[in-house]
Amino acid sequence: MAGELRIMENKSREDINLSPVSKIEIYSFFDPFSSDCFKLSAILSKLRIEYNQYIRIRHILNPSLKVLTKCQAQSTSNFDNIALAYKAAELQGRLRAERFIHLMQNEIIPKRDIITKSMICDCIQNAGIDLEVFKDDLQKSKLTESLKIDLHIAREMEIEQAPSLVFFSEDVHEEGLKVEGLYPYHIYTYIINELMGKPIEKNLPPKLETYIQQQQLVTMEELLTIYEWPEKLLNKELKKLAIQQKIEKLKYPDGDFWKSKMPKIKSK
């Protein structure tokens, strides 16, 4: 897979006033329209499951001219501009904003759909975000300022493409490691283990049923990444859940997806 591993100087983080973290901080720069970014989200979900006590992931919509132009071209107003919508969602919590962008990618990437106001509303509510507060926040000029801050961060870290991950240890005097492009899962776990500098224990993933209920829409590739089961075994378990009317299979141009028919698990 294409990509670049590059050491960065630590000044990129020191120049930015961000809350400190106790262990490893990962900056994830993404393009909401990129299929590689969509694939990386499965890897990040697995990292968060297995290494939750050791890492903190911060998602930043890559505010490059190319990405922002695509966001503008897909929109008719601030309401359906996904860049501004993501920044407004962040005001109600980063985890909810991440959930929102994941739901949006589930809509626009496999279906190749155009972004609409109703799509934004559905994903906002499904992410546990207050819709009325979100609408008010969309009118605030500070969203544009927030995008400018993200642009500053991206420039300081010399981000040239999405997806890109930047790993920092808890020592601000240590250099960061930038990974551009998409790599196999073990590359990211190797980096985490090297930065920790000691043996660390991994957490087990939740039950398959629970994970699909949390995510609502998942790809086969995502589930294979999370669970590392043989594809034949995974298909067998998915068929069991389908027979129980807990999930259903959907076919899209970019492949098959599995959708939860179970009640949504509310975001905290």
UniProtKB/Swiss-Prot annotation:
One of its GO terms (cellular component) is cytoplasm. It is found in: Cytoplasm. Signal peptide: none annotated. Keywords: Cytoplasm. It holds the Pfam family Thioredoxin_5. Adapter protein required for efficient degradation of Spx by ClpXP under non-stress conditions. Interaction with Spx stabilizes Spx and exposes the C-terminus of Spx for recognition and proteolysis by ClpXP. Interacts with Spx. Belongs to the SpxH family. This is ClpXP adapter protein SpxH. It comes from Staphylococcus aureus (strain MRSA252). The gene is spxH.
